[in-house]
Amino acid sequence: MISSSKRDELIVSKIRNGTVIDHIPAGRALAVLRILGIRGSEGYRVALVMNVESKKIGRKDIVKIEDRVIDEKEASLITLIAPSATINIIRDYVVTEKRHLEVPKQIRGLIKCPNPQCITNNDVEAESRFITISIKPLKLKCKYCEMYITEDDVIRQIL
């Protein structure tokens, strides 16, 4: 999947079908793989490019997964740790769908409130709900107990 054509250039071959997640902030690709439940033994062909130059965000990571399309829940979780990411769906070597991720104004059921006293941690029927306070840096507020969580808190939950 990887070949070198020039001294300073690394080329990752195209995938026939699957997903390419581009513009992931540098160092976050492993967290993206964790969200997707990919540990290396599932049989997917995966290309991971980390800490490469990007005109858009300075440095970035890229994840390519052959024969795997991510679902909405996975895309929503990726949005929280990589709000500038782009998800490209590939079919027969062609990008058939391109999604630019955006952090939603409200987040429901994706992450847990870290407050042990929050109703969402004490009532099995209560779904966690967070309101987005800021995107850069990511700051969310629990709708029930009003506890704030940051991007680092979200990453800790994922990892």
Swiss-Prot record:
Intrachain disulfide bonds: none
Cofactor remark: Binds 1 zinc ion per subunit.
Keywords attached to this entry: Metal-binding, Pyrimidine biosynthesis, Zinc
Sites where the protein binds Zn(2+): C113, C118, C142, C145
GO biological process, one term: 'de novo' pyrimidine nucleobase biosynthetic process
Cofactor: Zn(2+)
Keyword Transit peptide: no
Any one cellular-component term (Gene Ontology): aspartate carbamoyltransferase complex
Any GO MF annotation of the entry: metal ion binding
Summary of the function given for this chain in its UniProt record: Involved in allosteric regulation of aspartate carbamoyltransferase.
Quaternary structure note: Contains catalytic and regulatory chains.
Family: Belongs to the PyrI family.
Protein name, UniProt field: Aspartate carbamoyltransferase regulatory chain
Native source organism of the sequence: Saccharolobus solfataricus (strain ATCC 35092 / DSM 1617 / JCM 11322 / P2) (Sulfolobus solfataricus)
Species classification: Archaea, Thermoproteota, Thermoprotei, Sulfolobales, Sulfolobaceae
